[in-house]
Amino acid sequence: MERDGDQLSARPTLETEGLRFLHVTVGSLLATYGWYIVFSCILLYVVFQKLSTRLRALRQRHLDQAAAALEPDIVVKRQEALAAARLKMQEELNAQVEKHKEKLRQLEEEKRRQKIEMWDSMQEGKSYKGNTRKPQEEDSPGPSTSSVIPKRKSDRKPLRGGGYNPLSGEGGGTCSWRPGRRGPSSGGUG
């Protein structure tokens, strides 16, 4: 019986040593890697949640496709809706193309009209640089441009007398411009 008592007393000491060893080992692991373990658990939880929602959506899609395969009416309705959407988009695209073609046609007509006006003004001896304002003047009521006689350059008076040139020093006045001296202002190069 003493042996049984010794064995019973030896068993709790082994168990307590094992528990102490486990406690020390787990405690040191948690002390060293505790935050890493916590963050990895949180990360695993988030990843699991994301994957579970995607798996649910994937299962739902499979169920919908299986139901659609079983019901041909749904497939026909989807194809008709897709064809109607394509037709609508094609009509919108065709309308945009027509608008663009009309705009290009108007621009070409405007360019052609400006070239004709420029040619006519050159035939009359006018400058063609001021033609950008002509279409606005044509819209306003008033005398037509063909009835107005263009002035010649010889009819105009010069703004100043022909003999005055302020840079040359000629043409009157007591002061005349002279260029400054070159070289140092004072002292020699000695």
UniProtKB/Swiss-Prot annotation:
It is a single-pass membrane protein. Truncated SELENOS proteins produced by failed UGA/Sec decoding are ubiquitinated by the CRL2(KLHDC2) and CRL2(KLHDC3) complexes, which recognizes the glycine (Gly) at the C-terminus of truncated SELENOS proteins. Truncated SELENOS proteins produced by failed UGA/Sec decoding are also ubiquitinated by the CRL5(KLHDC1) complex. Keywords: Cytoplasm, Endoplasmic reticulum, Membrane, Phosphoprotein, Selenocysteine, Transmembrane, Transmembrane helix, Ubl conjugation. Residues 115-190 are annotated as: Disordered. The keyword Membrane applies. The keyword Aminoacyl-tRNA synthetase does not apply. The chain crosses the membrane at residues 28-48. Residues 160-174 have a biased composition (Gly residues). It comes from the Eukaryota. GO terms for biological process: endoplasmic reticulum unfolded protein response; retrograde protein transport, ER to cytosol. GO terms for cellular component: cytoplasmic microtubule; Derlin-1 retrotranslocation complex; Derlin-1-VIMP complex. It is found in: Endoplasmic reticulum membrane; Cytoplasm. The modification Phosphoserine is found at S140. This is Selenoprotein S. The gene is SELENOS.
